[in-house]
Amino acid sequence: MRERGLLIVFSGPSGVGKGTVRAKIFESENNFEYSVSMTTRKQRPGEVDGKDYYFRTRDEFEEMIRNGQMLEYAEYVGNYYGTPLTYVNQTLDEGKDVFLEIEVQGALQVKEKVPDGVFVFLTPPDLEELRGRLVGRGTDSAEVIASRLEKAKEEIRLMSEYDYAVVNDKVELAAERVKKIIEAEHYRVDRVIERYVHMIDDVKV
């Protein structure tokens, strides 16, 4: 019996380094699939449907919402973005671990539907470090940075909704911590007990 994969939900405040840590995790040999999001925004030159995004019309996306086919979704700058439930379930059934990198509010939506997922919160060492990273991007005004820091405070308060908290003090260390969490989750008794119960039942004494 093939073991079903794990749904790994990875989130944290803006600027904490989610994408950088996730990329470092994917550098080593693994059984991970990065979840492909669905969007209603226009397809850009060079983008491949089903690889970069699943591109759908607004009507198609809203119909999927009504039919309960989205694991999570949000509207941003007039376009929908979300995670299709069928893709996630098919990939998990193939025995692969699905890595879902999303914002905190999206993660809470997922937890309602998939409570046995592995929820990992990436946090900065402190808010001053986070401020430095946001300033270092050089893309946001002082007002935007202040707004992001206030939102970060709200998100950090929701850390208790997660299974694990990982400090991103160094990218390499943070990536190793997340990999160890995932490895340990595969050996939890509630995930493997059926396999071993069948083994005992099959033995004739």
Curated annotation (Swiss-Prot):
Residues engaged in binding ATP: 12-19
Subcellular location(s) per record: Cytoplasm
Pfam families, A to Z: Guanylate_kin
Reaction catalysis annotation: GMP + ATP = GDP + ADP
InterPro entries per record: GK/Ca_channel_bsu (IPR008145), Guanylate_kin-like_dom (IPR008144), Guanylate_kinase (IPR017665), Guanylate_kinase_CS (IPR020590), P-loop_NTPase (IPR027417)
SMART domains registered for this protein in UniProt: GuKc
Gene Ontology CC annotations of this record: cytosol
Keywords from the named record: ATP-binding, Cytoplasm, Kinase, Nucleotide-binding, Transferase
Function: Essential for recycling GMP and indirectly, cGMP.
Family: Belongs to the guanylate kinase family.
Protein name: Guanylate kinase
Record gene name: gmk
